[in-house]
Amino acid sequence: MNNAIAQQIAEQGGVEAYLHAQQHKSLLRFLTCGSVDDGKSTLIGRLLHDTRQIYEDQLSTLHTDSKRLGTQGDKLDLALLVDGLQAEREQGITIDVAYRYFSTEKRKFIIADTPGHEQYTRNMATGASTCDVAILLIDVRKGVLDQTRLHSFISTLLGIRHLVVAVNKMDLVAFDEQIFQGIRQDYLRFAEQLPVDLDITFVPLSALEGDNVAALGKAMPWYNGPTLLDVLETVEVINLNEQQPARFPVQYVNRPNLDFRGYAGTVAAGVLRVGQAVKVLPSGVTSTISRIVTFDGDLTEAWAGEAVTLVLKDEVDISRGDLLVDAGETLTEVQNAQVDVVWMTEQPLVAGQSFDIKIAGKKTRARVDNIQYQVDINTLTQRVADSLPLNGIGLVELAFDEPMILDKYADNPTTGGMIFIDRLSNVTVGAGMVRQPLQDVYREPGAYGEFELALNALVRRHFPHWGARDLLGGK
């Protein structure tokens, strides 16, 4: 047990009171990003150190490792707290996304330390996909670089609206205010070109020395703003998913015995309640929620982000990949969509290629009909392109093999986000965010021709192993 936790337990009167308080603290997910050697891992190590989140054995090991592998002379190399891979320690860089957890009296945090090297940009995008805030580090000696712009754009593309620009290594320029202000103006000029409105906070700091990280440093009397930790503890993040219409992608059909059939998954948006009428898509069948089951007991309602198992009143044909929505909501099935793509493999993306696509629990296939443009990261302008290279970002049009229920990524990242999977190697090669669903192919149940209904009945009767659904919504 570290000293900070021990002190909180003592102050709150025991372990149970401490755990109860932890459950009711808000959770903030943030990532550190930016160019290589800007000090991302050192900053996280400093946060953990100054908030007393390091255990005694970890601190002892850190002293030993700093002498053997450290790059800071006689000082503790705090980056070693985060860089756990042998290759990371040997090269002094971050390769994989490293997650760390800590808490203060005001909030709980999950940190994603992401790599700055261009070849690991895909790892950075992975880390950003679940975060609320991005800490963008800038080396005060180098200013705004290409990777700074790239990581800023990817963060906004993935829905992050709060950026903290941490101008690091101020100790190496004698804490010069003019240099800091120059970088601030350069970044603001760049940010004006980003496609969304952002909440941007600038903090000058020294991760190595600790100035303005968890406490204000005396070396910068000209700075009268908050520390980095103050920003993280007070930033207001609104869970927009709770305000959206209900979405429940089915991940797994839970059938432990003949007396129980439940549909497991995470509520992607909105709220679901016992007694609520829901519609199953794509079949269109309706039923009512009879139970909301969790490991800790039944709930009366489940909000966005909660993992639950739903039990319905009726025996309904539901499988992995189906979507449960409110019964009164009319959704449109589409077979084409405009999708923002971050390409993650050395083999370029070209029009005409087909991929396996995974959206929430559903796996399907899609073809890239065309690449509408590629984004020039330096200028954020659009340019004509017939392919997307590794780390390329662009807008493509996808044609799915079957009608799909899609939301815009900005409205719902779960039902509007996807990954591209190579059909031969089964490797994830890209990430996609639905910009705009296209081509209405929706038909109300019953709006089928006589021939279609007869063919559907024939297939279901003689070829049940094909898994065809009843177009009339029956079993």
Curated annotation (Swiss-Prot):
Q: Name one GO molecular function term.
A: GTPase activity
User: CDD domains this protein is in?
Assistant: CysN_ATPS, CysN_NodQ_II, CysN_NoDQ_III
For the region G2, what residue ranges are annotated? 92-96
Residues binding GTP, per UniProt:
34-41, 113-117, 168-171
Q: What is its EC number?
A: 2.7.7.4
- GO annotation (BP), single: hydrogen sulfide biosynthetic process
Q: What are the alphabetically sorted keywords of the record?
A: ATP-binding, GTP-binding, Nucleotide-binding, Nucleotidyltransferase, Transferase
Where does this protein act, in terms of pathway?
Sulfur metabolism; hydrogen sulfide biosynthesis; sulfite from sulfate: step 1/3
- What does it catalyze? sulfate + ATP + H(+) = adenosine 5'-phosphosulfate + diphosphate
Region spans: G1: 34-41
**Domain of life here?**
Bacteria
Entry-linked Gene3D superfamilies: P-loop containing nucleotide triphosphate hydrolases, Translation factors
Oligomeric form and interacting partners: Heterodimer composed of CysD, the smaller subunit, and CysN.
Q: Spell out the NCBIfam families in the cross-references.
A: CysN, PRK05124.1, small_GTP
Checking HAMAP family in the record gives:
Sulf_adenylyltr_sub1
Q: What is the similarity comment for this entry?
A: Belongs to the TRAFAC class translation factor GTPase superfamily. Classic translation factor GTPase family. CysN/NodQ subfamily.
Q: What is this protein called?
A: Sulfate adenylyltransferase subunit 1
Whose protein is this, by species? Sodalis glossinidius (strain morsitans)
